[in-house]
């Protein structure tokens, strides 16, 4: 919060040798690189990432939907270098480890609201507290809406609009020498597909090579304004649900932790390039 970070991409800008960028062709999908190792083809589901993402002990096999709001996170760790001993495969470059807040013994709550340009309307809230002497509960809700950063000169409207809703309930049971926490998450992200534009490369060799293929030239500055010229906005429909169960048992002067998890994800997107 002190950094005013909103997504993992913001965290990456303050971390040496780390790029936690968003994938260009699939919104809200990570294209993470640590120490030069990563995967640039995350629009293809079969591409294995070299930088793993772990939330509450659950590894993400596919890093769709990881570039979302950081609200309700207790901690974020960026581990550089191979992490196979701890997390198995797909972590040769490193890992991004996140932990959400746990249900508290004390009743408390927090609300965060943001209004910004381009129709940004964000509201997030979390409430936590005891349900009984041995049971604590928590529920967090994240809602984000925006009209889109780009203006489509062909369709005459904004492009890049998205609507995000994430609901994350959790419950903790405490007993003599053990505790068990179940964390569920349901999320839906709907909006436009990727925003693309053609532009004239300011390099003679590249220009001639591109033009030789029959591609039409657009003699414009790609960084001058936030416009796009595609014939359609495209579409994004991304949803997932997950469940993590963490069991901690005091055993012989230490703690034995067991984590079981499942995540089901459905993603459908298309765009005009």
Predicted feature residues:
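Short structured motifs
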Residues: 18-20, 124, 229-230
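Short loop/turn motifs enriched for small/polar and acidic residues
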Residues: 35-37, 144, 183-187
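Outer-membrane beta-barrel domain signature, strongest for Gram-negative TonB-dependent receptors
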Residues: 156, 162-273
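Acidic, small-polar-rich N-terminal luminal/periplasmic segments of exported/outer-membrane proteins
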Residues: 1-106
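Outer-membrane beta-barrel translocator/receptor signature
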Residues: 49-50, 62, 71-80, 85-152, ...
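Short strand-loop junctions, especially beta-strand C-caps/beta-turns
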Residues: 37, 58, 112-114, 231
């Amino acid at each position: 919060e002190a950094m005013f970070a909103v997504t993992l991409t913001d965290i990456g800008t303050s971390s040496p040798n780390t790029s936690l960028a968003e994938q260009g062709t699939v919104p809200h999908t990570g294209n993470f690189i640590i120490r030069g190792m990563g995967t640039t083809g995350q629009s293809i589901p079969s591409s294995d990432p070299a930088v793993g993402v772990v939330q509450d002990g659950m590894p993400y096999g596919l890093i769709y939907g990881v570039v979302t709001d950081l609200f309700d996170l207790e901690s974020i760790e960026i581990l550089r270098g191979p992490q196979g001993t701890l997390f198995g495969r797909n972590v040769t470059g490193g890992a991004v480890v996140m932990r959400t807040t746990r249900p508290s013994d004390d009743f408390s709550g927090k609300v965060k609201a943001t209004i910004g340009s381009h129709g940004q309307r964000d509201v997030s809230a979390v409430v936590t507290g005891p349900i009984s002497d041995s049971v604590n509960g928590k529920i967090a809700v994240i809602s984000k809406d925006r009209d889109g950063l780009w203006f489509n000169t062909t369709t005459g409207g904004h492009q890049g609009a998205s609507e995000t809703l994430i609901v994350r309930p959790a419950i903790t049971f405490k007993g003599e020498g053990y505790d068990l926490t179940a964390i569920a998450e349901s999320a839906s992200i709907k909006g436009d597909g990727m925003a693309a534009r053609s532009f004239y490369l300011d390099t003679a060799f590249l220009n001639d090579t591109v033009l030789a293929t029959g591609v039409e030239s657009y003699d414009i500055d790609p960084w001058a304004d936030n416009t796009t010229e595609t014939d359609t906005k495209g579409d994004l429909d991304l949803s997932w649900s997950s469940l993590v169960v963490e069991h901690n048992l005091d055993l012989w002067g230490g703690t034995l932790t067991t984590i079981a998890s499942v995540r089901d994800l459905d993603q459908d997107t298309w765009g005009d390039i």
